[in-house]
Amino acid sequence: MLASLASAQQVTKTVHKKAVKTDMVTTGTLTIRKPDYVCIATDGDKDLLIMDGTKFTMTMGGKQHVTDSRKNPQFATFHSVLKAVINHQPIPAGEELTTTRSGGLTTITIIPAGKKRQLFTSFVLTVDAKTLAFRTLRMNGRNEDYTEYTFK
């Protein structure tokens, strides 16, 4: 499916915690609408990651975090990348951003400059180089912890 259509894709979410022996795996859906709406719902809609314009809402384990990309530089870059992919536009250049291509995939890595008090140390989005369909989104935390979404 093209990422630019109002569409739903299946998603598998893997939460890896270094201190826990077994990864937590749940499934759900990814919904995308132009120009800049993304909703990843997993675990029976208990866990949500929503980008609605510049507003990001993340609900995990009953805790909700809300931020606005206009006030949070880490999410400003993430927002501009997602919006570009959804709308089939060039990925914006930036100091915190690297883009690589390999095997028909484009990998976009965002490493925030100011790592103090950030929820994540980096974001890694992999998309199909031709269709720009989302393939994976990995949000790396501290201590080798991460949350990874795999899209089908």
Where in this protein do the model-derived segments appear?
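Short hydrophobic/aromatic-rich beta-strand segments that constitute the beta-sheet cores
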Residues: K13, V38-T42, F56-T59, I108-I110, ...
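A short, compositionally biased
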Residues: A6-A8, I50-T54, T131-F134
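Gly/Pro-enriched, hydrophobic low-complexity segments
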Residues: T99-K152
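Extracytoplasmic
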Residues: V25-T27, P35, G44, G53, ...
